[in-house]
Amino acid sequence: MSSLAQALRVHRLVQDDVALRMLRMDSLPLVAGVLATHLGAPNASLPTHELHDALDAELDTLRDHLDLSGRTAKAYCEDWRQAGLLERRIADEAREEVYELTPAARQGLRVVEQLLAPRASVTESRLVSLLTALHQLA
């Protein structure tokens, strides 16, 4: 495959893939902090009013540390729904609207978690060297 063809494929991917768009959002710290906390568990859903209330309660503190606008929680959630990060549906058992993360949002949050995780950089040969040195000390 030529460089041009590969570059065009990646360009289309960046434009079309919801997870990649999420990773490029200015609100990614807010998305990763709030949505992972409240909806990050497998199969998690939350009534829309509960997520709005939780996010509104957190926005005051988050604004002290992040460069956030004065937007409401409801406005952020609507933006994230339109961006393909949140799905809003009627819950079967409660007959109220709930939010859930989309598969693309979960994928994007996994990438963020992987990048935040400490990396183990000890190689097998380094471990052997350390064990040999410990054995010689004993």
Positions of the model-derived regions?
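Short, hydrophobic/amphipathic alpha-helical patches that form generic packing surfaces
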Residues: 29-37
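Intrinsically disordered, low-complexity serine/threonine- and proline-rich regulatory segments
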Residues: 1-30
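Extended assembly-interface/linker segments at domain junctions
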Residues: 47-137
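Non-transmembrane, amphipathic alpha-helical segments
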Residues: 19-23, 43, 72, 100
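Generic structural signal for short, flexible, solvent-exposed coil/loop and linker residues
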Residues: 2-3, 9-12, 35, 74-75, ...
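Short helix-capping/hinge SLiMs at alpha-helix to coil transitions
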Residues: 38-45
